Amino acid sequence: ICVNQNIMKKFIYTTVLFFTAFYSFGQYFLIYEFESENQSDTMEMFDLMMSTTKEVVGKDLNMVTFQKELSNTHFLVRTYASLQEWVDEDKASEEINPQVFQKLSGVENIQEKFLAMQKATDGKGARLFELLPEYSNMSPYLAMSNEEKKEYKYRRVVLYDLTDAGEQAFLANQKFWIDSDKELGVDYLYALMKPVFATDADYMLVLLDKSRFDYHKNWSDRMDKRFSDEDFNANYEKIEKDPVSSVVEEWNLNLLEEFIY
């Protein structure tokens, strides 16, 4: 049992270090990916850890959980206002972690719950992304109440690799779409992010909507407006001929409302 307690303590300390912070929105997103053969076993223990952490710090953790459609892959997402705050979190964890572990130690059957989670869960690691505000449209979302934000349950995630045209060509094309959308009255929620450390993609675009059905309908409406514009068509044909990026992967993610902290 002592060995199990030490393993559990180390895991909890590491997890709390990753996911405790007290900022409502930031320039950096930490995205932790894991697969679960048994969501109930995984999330029961994780829910205990995060709920206890929230109780200890006395504030919302501003963390949300998503599940990839038709998959056992999950993503835990939280934000930092700056890289310095990411570093400062390590210092805060020295005080928070022992309190969290002490409270969890008193939970009935905690060893069994932890071992069940450990057996069911395969962690894939964390990625840190920087938001590029000038290539994003998140202000309307940030102005919403927490209840309004919960209505936006769907995320379309597109991972891009750059072509030989280079980064400036990719960003110039993104800027063209943004400017064109403003002229055409096209408005939707999206965030363009760049990995802080090297990953399997150069950029990540996240599009927000209330459901996958709403996303596809709104996407179709947007494209109809865009293709009605001569300048947009000319740029589209140019990029089709000489691409500035290629799609590495696309995800359809749904918010798990019961696991918001």
Language model: regions and residue ranges:
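Bacterial Sec-dependent N-terminal signal peptides
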Residues: I1-Y28
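Short S/T/G/P-rich N-terminal loop/turn motif that feeds into the first structured element of a domain
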Residues: G26-E230, A234-Y261
